Amino acid sequence: MALSKLFSSACWLNSTVNSPNKPKFAPEQEEEDNYKESALSWIYEKLPTSFVPYAQLVRLDKPTGTWLLYLPCAWSISMASYHANLPLNQTISMLGLFGIGAFVMRGAGCTINDMWDSHIDRMVERTKTRPLASDKITQIEALSFLAIQLSAGLSILTRLNLYSLVAIYPYMKRVTFWPQLFLGFAFNWGALLGWPAMLDSSDFTVTLPLYASGDKKYDKLVDVKSTALLFGSNTRKWLSLFSGAMVSLVALSGYANVQGLPFYLISVAGSTTHLFWIVHKTDFDKAEECGRKFRMSKWTGGVVWLGILVDDIWKRVMM
């Protein structure tokens, strides 16, 4: 699921290059991170006022990140269920457990990222309204909230060891042009955990650059590194390469798991079509379009999961 972050970081740098007369951080350049612009921003109106900054901190109205973290877990769990013909109640229970864990740990990752980058977020239009950047909460309050998140994550999912990988991402933006690679490891680690969680044995990231593309002009201005800056005008070629690698590995994992025809028709063919449509139809000069395509990337993972589920149902019916 790692192409979406790189894809969303290739756009704003292009708009800066193409519009040299604009101020570096012009007020009119506000982007989709403003909370009131979200389709789910009504959630904040239902919460007590004191809870709102913390809900904003975990991006409660922006579930795409949770989906990108959860779907690799769901693939692995569902493939294990298919492989061993496990009872549906066991599969559903594990899917629910990992779902809660994905929500909690994605929120913890957002908290860590915002704590580390609050001074930079204040200079970027897309992120300047975040709770820490806008001083709605303090670093101490955020740290206390993070402790609660990590405690909840530990009690819910002791096997989902995402903290160490999530925590290192903000630092990687300062030392390497490949921070999305490390974030991709964090988002896809669940693909390695779902199977052993189901079977007590051990027997696959592609869309993160999309997200990074949305911020690349600001990354350059504040000297933060990203794959979008590294790839530059070759972003589409790199994303095509990573997309091909992803769908090839999905197909290979299906072959190794003896998946049936529904898997290849839906998971492989469907995700291939959707990924390459995203990569080749995106205008990297338009930050808002990159943001929309990033949010659509969850459907790539959803298609893969759908194929696994349909294949499992087909197998159970035919047996």
Predicted regions and their residues:
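Multi-pass alpha-helical membrane architecture of UbiA-family
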Residues: 1-319
